[in-house]
Structure formats: structure tokens, C-alpha cells
Amino acid sequence: MARIAGVDLPREKRVEIALTYIFGIGLSRSKQILRDTGVDPNKRVKDLTDDEVAKIRDYIDKNFKVEGELRAEIARNIKRLIDIRCYRGLRHLRGLPVRGQRTRTNARTRKGPRKTVGVMRKKS
């Protein structure tokens, strides 16, 4: 089983698709990695030689931030926005949409499920 950047790649999938299981590597970056390392993208992971796996692993380690390192950088960036109290940071802090979407309706993904507000009636 090929293990790259701390992720076990699925053995039966094509290398091109299997690399996308690594956080920070999508399909276009996967194609770029395989083109630059000279590995056939249509090969299955189980058919890769140890040299090819090592070549891919080294290329990813040298050129990209992936998995934990990338997650940590994203978290640091959000924390920095919150610390400097900019508009985007405040939106993150309040759990609201950051990129200008409407919030009067919708925005349920960021706001979570609705909180029902009850009405108190006078006893008569």
C-alpha cells in the first residue's frame, strides 16, 4: 500500500485519482505532479514501483504544503484575521458568511439549524 504525506492511497484506484485523497491536492495538481515526475496517470496504485512512490512522495514534500501543515496554515490565517479584528475576522468569529453572502435568509450552513423563538401570551 502506497503511503504519501501520511495518507494511505486506495490500491485499486488510478494514481491520478488516488492522489486527490491527500488534503491540498486536487485533480489538476495531481495531473501536474504525475507529469513532472514522469509517472503514468492511468496506472493503478497497486502497480506502482517503490521508486515511483518515492519520486511522487519527494516531489510533494518539496513543492507543496499538504495535510496537517496546510490545515495549520489555514487555521493560522483565520486566527490572524480574528486577532486584527478586521471585517473578515469578525465574520469568522461570529460564525457568519465571510464572502458577502446575504444573511437575512439562507446562510444556514454557517449559522447552523434554526433557533425557534417562542411568543409569550398574556393569560386572560
Swiss-Prot record:
A single BP term in Gene Ontology: translation
Keywords tagged on the record: Ribonucleoprotein, Ribosomal protein, RNA-binding, rRNA-binding, tRNA-binding
Segments for region (Disordered): 99-124
A Gene Ontology cellular-component term: small ribosomal subunit
Any GO molecular function: rRNA binding
Annotated Basic residues bias: 101-124
Pfam families: Ribosomal_S13
Entries under InterPro entries matching the protein: Rbsml_uS13_C, Ribosomal_uS13, Ribosomal_uS13-like_H2TH, Ribosomal_uS13_bac-type, Ribosomal_uS13_CS
Signal peptide: none
SUPFAM superfamilies: S13-like H2TH domain
Listed PROSITE patterns: RIBOSOMAL_S13_1, RIBOSOMAL_S13_2
Coiled-coil region(s): none
Gene3D superfamilies per the UniProt record, alphabetical: 1.10.8.50, 30s ribosomal protein s13, domain 2
Keyword check for Protein biosynthesis: no
Family: Belongs to the universal ribosomal protein uS13 family.
Family matches, as NCBIfam families: uS13_bact
Role description: Located at the top of the head of the 30S subunit, it contacts several helices of the 16S rRNA. In the 70S ribosome it contacts the 23S rRNA (bridge B1a) and protein L5 of the 50S subunit (bridge B1b), connecting the 2 subunits; these bridges are implicated in subunit movement. Contacts the tRNAs in the A and P-sites.
Subunit organization: Part of the 30S ribosomal subunit. Forms a loose heterodimer with protein S19. Forms two bridges to the 50S subunit in the 70S ribosome.
Name under which the protein is recorded: Small ribosomal subunit protein uS13
